[in-house]
From Swiss-Prot:
Lineage: superkingdom: Bacteria
Region described as Disordered: 333-364
Location within or outside the cell: Cytoplasm
Statement: the UniProt record of this protein carries the keyword Acyltransferase: no
Protein name: GTPase Obg
PROSITE patterns: G_OBG, GTP1_OBG, OBG
Function according to Swiss-Prot or TrEMBL: An essential GTPase which binds GTP, GDP and possibly (p)ppGpp with moderate affinity, with high nucleotide exchange rates and a fairly low GTP hydrolysis rate. Plays a role in control of the cell cycle, stress response, ribosome biogenesis and in those bacteria that undergo differentiation, in morphogenesis control.
Gene name of this polypeptide: obg
UniProt subunit comment: Monomer.
Xref: Pfam families: GTP1_OBG, MMR_HSR1
InterPro entries cross-referenced by the UniProt entry: G_OBG, GTP-bd, GTP-bd_Obg/CgtA, GTP1-OBG_CS, GTP1_OBG_dom, GTP1_OBG_dom_sf, OBG_GTPase, P-loop_NTPase
Organism in which the protein naturally occurs: Rhizobium johnstonii (strain DSM 114642 / LMG 32736 / 3841)
Molecular-function GO term, any one: magnesium ion binding
Swiss-Prot/TrEMBL cofactor(s): Mg(2+)
Length: 364
């Protein structure tokens, strides 16, 4: 499946149906009173986070979403039917922005979380509403109110526990493939990975999600190479695993290059817990390995792990270190209170279903 992490979408909620002008007509009743019903409410446009999606590719082929209009009221005080809602299904981790791409509308981080992006127009009053003591036969009704329309942007930030960062060909995809069932493309040339990949790692019967993003190079924050646009997918992680290839001539410089790009990107990425590992050590002899490990330790200020996805050396130790940080972070974080029902704009339920919003607001 192709990966797409942003999409531009036009949405429009349904117009409200018009009220009816009608009078009671029965045998032997010459002057029946008004009995025009109200118009139905227009359908809403919702967005919902669902499980099983990790791309916005569907929105490349459909960018317009319109809810149906409410039907007009009818005689005998019959209210028109409400319009049908439209729901945009998006991956968990999707953020919705206004057209300016700066104003955040909502951030969907929980499966089943829903948000009303555009409210349907209220139906108009029928003439039965306008009967008074001085006007027993009103011959007018209200039209329905128009729905809302806007253009929005969808931005996906994948939900993962740990993120893999490093220069191109640092062994990130090989690491992911060796500890999870993910099958990213692996080849001996730069930028083999062109989009993020996710995998579930298991260590000591505990699972966590790993995210592998395309490699960073010097100047990525200025658009060099693939740039830093995919760094958003590790913003939500608990810890970063920084891999430096043992094949780099200057491993200390390689570490600092990526670190500088993380600082230039911002969004507190450099404040995250970090594990540093010298990868692909199977290509070095003992003397060279010792030399490069010492150089990398000096650059990062800590003793790096030594790993090889080919031989399996050091892999278990790194996974356990990642697990410990993730478990500690999850323990320290206060459990979020997920309400079963919130205001009309946002609804979250245990089953991921909308249990309804405000009632009694079908009229203007």
């Amino acid at each position: 499946m192709k990966f797409l992490d942003e999409a531009k979408v036009y949405i429009k909620s349904g117009d409200g149906g018009g009220g009816s002008v009608s009078f009671r007509r029965e045998k032997f009743i010459e002057f029946g009173g008004p009995d025009g019903g109200d118009g139905g409410r227009g359908g809403d446009v919702w967005v919902e986070a669902v499980n099983g999606l990790n791309t916005l590719i569907d929105f490349r082929y459909q960018q317009h979403f319109k809810a149906t209009i409410g039907t007009h009221g009818m005689g005998r005080n019959r209210t028109g039917a409400n319009g049908s809602d439209v729901t945009l299904k998006v991956p968990v981790g999707t953020q919705i922005f206004e057209e300016d791409q700066e104003t955040l509308i909502c951030d969907l981080t929980v499966e089943g979380q829903r948000y009303c992006l555009a409210h349907g127009g209220n139906g108009g009053f029928g003439n039965a509403h306008f009967k008074t003591s001085t006007n027993q036969a009103p011959d007018w009704a209200n039209p329905g109110l128009p729905g809302e329309e806007k253009t929005i942007w969808l931005h996906l930030k994948l939900i993962a526990d740990a993120g893999l960062v490093g220069l191109p060909n640092a062994g990130k995809s090989t690491f992911l493939a060796s500890v999870t069932r993910a099958r990213p493309k692996i080849a001996n040339y730069p930028f083999t990975t062109l989009h993020p990949n996710l995998g579930v790692a298991t260590i000591d019967e505990r699972e966590f999600i790993l995210a592998d993003i395309p490699g960073l190079i010097e100047g990525a924050h200025e658009g060099v190479g693939i740039g830093d646009r995919f760094l958003g997918h590790v913003e939500r992680t608990r810890v970063l695993l920084h891999l430096i290839s043992a094949q780099e001539e200057k491993v200390g410089k390689a570490y600092k290059t990526v670190k500088h790009e993380l600082e230039a990107y911002g969004n507190e990425l450099t404040d995250k817990a970090e594990i540093v590992a010298l990868s692909q050590i199977d290509v070095l002899d003992d003397a060279e390995l010792k030399k490069k490990t010492k150089e990398l330790a000096k650059a990062c200020g800590k003793t790096p792990f030594q790993i090889s996805a080919v031989t399996g050396k050091g892999m278990t130790e790194v996974l356990r270190a990642l697990r410990d940080i993730i478990v500690e972070a999850n323990t320290e974080e206060k459990p979020a209170k997920v309400p079963k029902l919130r205001h009309r704009d946002m609804v979250v339920t245990d089953e991921g279903e909308d249990k309804g919003g405000d009632e009694g607001d079908d009229q203007p």
